[in-house]
Amino acid sequence: LLLLNDLDSGGYMIQIKSKLDCCGCTACASSCPKSAITMVPDEEGFLYPKIDMRRCIECGACERACPILNKKTVISEKTEGYIIRIKDNKILYESTSGGAFTALADYILEQNGIVYGAGYDNNMRVVCKRATTKQQLQEMRGSKFVQSDLGNIFQDIKKELKEGTTILFSGTPCQVAGLLSFLRKKPDNLLCVDFVCRGVPSPGLWDNYVKYMENKYSSKIVGARFKHKTYGYHTSTMKIDFANGKTYYGSGRVDPYMKAFVREISSRPSCAACAFKGIERPSDITVFDCYEYSKITGRKDDNRGYSSIFVHTEKGGKILEAIKSHIEIQEEDVNSLVTENGVMVCNSAKPHPRRAEFYLLAEHYPIDEALNKIEPITLKDKIIEKSKRFLFKTGLITVARHLNKGKKVEVVENK
């Protein structure tokens, strides 16, 4: 699978026969005892491993750490399904769905533990961050539709686990698999929380979008929410805050970054054949949306958001039990949650046929111009977007949502 080719620079590049076989989890780089492997962006902006053979001792640690080369069959202790929602209304509003991550993370912090999850650096790049206080958790809250840069986080986590610290690591399924493959075993003081993932766009494309928006609004971005509940949970929207006090809202109809994402134009190549799909997972808890709350439970949906979760391990079950006073919770059939909310639990999204062309364009054009050549934002899109505020205030947005419900994600079945 891994080939070494000499570069003009004198280094060597780990090349993957197919980019479907590298998820960018950093397990190989983190495992190298000589720090011979670095993660470098390709032409699309996704990180891939590069090896310096002047440092390499050919020990094979990198190959042993790869979660795709060494994929393990996962047999969960007993996966249970639940719908939950945090009781704190402020946190619920700030959360993408039902606030499950915050409820779990708060508990870990209360046990003097440490939480790792996606946040922003000073340049609005999405990176894995470390939280020891509830204040630091705030920027981890909410979805980030960008592949986060893990840096040396795996090594930091390994050190803290050895010291006996309780750790919650939250990430994509491939990041969780990468961490566990790097560690070689799952310590008792590690709680892994993954989520049902549609795919991860590249950090390079996100940089393109940030520059485009900052030029358009003549101001630096100071905050970003990919699925803000401005118009309710079921009609979430991108929200961007600028240093000059302006705020932008745009859904997947009119926002170029979000439209590229929902049209399956921007995800990493390996996402098209994700190796980590399925109900049974190496994580302790899996979190995903619960859009069909009424259909599953027969109760009214107030459009403020719920989380579907799978509990895979006894450890996950004990922590769920410990946070019950902070959440609304009801047990539901696992297969019902998958059928109604979880098409992406077991399937990969089928990539857009012009995906490669889009990324070539994005190398040379701002994201809006690149997207316009592939999936133009139409006048109809703009009219519908402008009508959302009126529809939300009058309650008609619920009717519009039901009329639009027939559209489904095209998927590739993962065998």
Predicted regions, residues:
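Immediate flanking context of iron-sulfur cluster ligation sites
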Residues: 14-22, 53-57, 164-167, 254-269, ...
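Short, flexible loop segments at boundaries between secondary-structure elements
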Residues: 191-212
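Flanking helices and flexible, charged tails adjoining ferredoxin-like Fe-S electron-transfer domains
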Residues: 5-12, 54-163, 330, 335-371
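Local cysteine-cluster metal-coordination motifs and their immediate loop/turn environment
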Residues: 20-35, 57-69, 172-178, 267-279
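Long, compositionally biased charged/polar accessory segments in the mid-to-C-terminal portions
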Residues: 111-114, 214, 219-415
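Iron-sulfur cluster-binding cysteine motifs and their immediate structural context
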Residues: 12-16, 27-50, 60-78, 284-285
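Conserved nucleotide-cofactor-binding alpha/beta core module
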Residues: 143-168, 173-192
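Gly/Ser/Thr-rich loops at beta-strand to alpha-helix junctions
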Residues: 96-99, 122, 169-179, 199-201
